Amino acid sequence: MSKIIGIDLGTTNSCVAVMEGGEPKVIPNPEGNRTTPSVVAFKNEERQVGEVAKRQAITNPNTIMSVKRHMGTDYKVEVEGKDYTPQEISAIILQNLKASAEAYLGETVTKAVITVPAYFNDAERQATKDAGRIAGLEVERIINEPTAAALAYGLEKQDEEQKILVYDLGGGTFDVSILELADGTFEVISTAGDNRLGGDDFDQVIIDHLVAEFKKENNIDLSQDKMALQRLKDAAEKAKKDLSGVTQTQISLPFISAGAAGPLHLELTLTRAKFEELSAGLVERTLEPTRRALKDAGFAPSELDKVILVGGSTRIPAVQEAIKRETGKEPYKGVNPDEVVALGAAVQGGVLTGDVEGVLLLDVTPLSLGIETMGGVFTKLIERNTTIPTSKSQVFSTAADNQPAVDIHVLQGERPMSADNKTLGRFQLTDLPPAPRGIPQIEVTFDIDANGIVNVRAKDLGTSKEQAITIQSSSGLSDEEVERMVQEAEANADADQKRKEEVELRNEADQLVFQTDKVVKDLEGKVDAAEVAKATEAKEALQAAIEKNELEEIRAKKDALQEIVQQLTVKLYEQAQAAAGQAEGAQGAQDAGAKKDNVVDAEFEEVKEDK
């Protein structure tokens, strides 16, 4: 069975891993880094992903970051006259990770396990699955990030019974999950979180502070200057990381703006204490879901065996201190917070292929599911933290006499009124036979699969008429839309590959021109002048083709020049060999003569021993 790769599709960074020799291994990207920034840039119809895209974000307005925050919504971003959905942008990142995996494994990759925040709702999960399909991947399983982290952590500790809390603070989302590990079973007991809280928010409080300080000093609002804002974002992210290791850092941004007197510079020292003061509210926001998860699990903090930190933002000292204070446990530092989720996804891939045996993963649904009933009340059918996959049915009836149809309004959330919860979808069960209110028996069944994706069906028990819906939220893409995006993604991948080949061809041609100049110089006076002239002529023809940017002509002229240079190089090599041979012969004769001239006659003296 082909390999199933594990992908952590993050808000700020993404990571890909695979099972090798019974161990999950992170696959480095072409630059040799183990994580790839989740950044996509468009420049002259070329798409760039990762570090190269992030580096030019200051000067390129067509750079898209943190798109994961918009998954499952109808958000679109316009780039070069075309609208892109979050699924399409995510698919470009996934294609990049897929290519890294294929280069590493030396084989085509078609299957993946992709992780999502535990608190992602149905629409966000469906959008992630669609992104995988657009990227040319069969998404074998969607799993929750904290659960994946626990899988990677617990793979070697299956014989120990443990209660663990996974605290996952990423770039844009926050999750906390409580799990029990025993005999190879990883059972999620409860989960809670906040999909609008992460490292980006910690960057933002620094940006706001810098903007306020600069405005106070210069009366100029940098938040209105797009290029200045991107420089501030980069500086804030760097300062945040610096303050995990040092107690103060210098932020220096020369020529950030200009006033009447000339250019203005931003110079500021940010202390860890000030950063902790600015971000105290964000740290506190992580503790409420932590308490809720513990309460839902029915555990006291003292019952926990381990606290595992996941996500780059957990390197912030104030975050570590807060979770230590809340649980009374020193956080476990034995996992890499940037890589552990991808490693866990690879383990799940190994479970699905049969490479990893004796592991059973029992996950839960993060939010309650139900329908709207009379008076706008939200009636729950499946409570949050129910182990998935699961199915639940309940019988409802009509609210009016002779009602010909019922509207089924499917919702997800925890609030008592429908209006306060997230709408997943609506559908109708029609052609009900006339009957007084309360008589028709309508059975509504919810199914949640192992990916946490919802299917709902309604059945009139009197007529056996049935209507089903796989939830398509307002952002949900139809099969036709996904198929169109798949084709566009493939076409773009082909175009990107073609562009890469064109660049490589031009580079090779430039290199050959340089090499020809060197060979011609070395051969001056050593070979027939006509041969040198032939090489020079072919080189000039190639240079002319490069200037015209005619690819087929470049290819033909390059091949012709390559042959001439090869022949000249052989001659140069032969001459060097001949010269070396002559020099060796002359040296040998010289050594022989020297030996002859320097012969010393031995002198003997007879010594008579006294006896």
UniProtKB/Swiss-Prot annotation:
One of its GO terms (biological process) is chaperone cofactor-dependent protein refolding. InterPro entries: ATPase_NBD, Chaperone_DnaK, Heat_shock_70_CS, HSP70_C_sf, HSP70_peptide-bd_sf, Hsp_70_fam. CDD domains: ASKHA_NBD_HSP70_DnaK-like. Keywords: ATP-binding, Chaperone, Nucleotide-binding, Phosphoprotein, Stress response. Coiled coil: none annotated. The modification Phosphothreonine is found at residue 173. Induction: By stress conditions e.g. heat shock. Acts as a chaperone. This is Chaperone protein DnaK. It comes from Bacillus cereus (strain ATCC 14579 / DSM 31 / CCUG 7414 / JCM 2152 / NBRC 15305 / NCIMB 9373 / NCTC 2599 / NRRL B-3711).
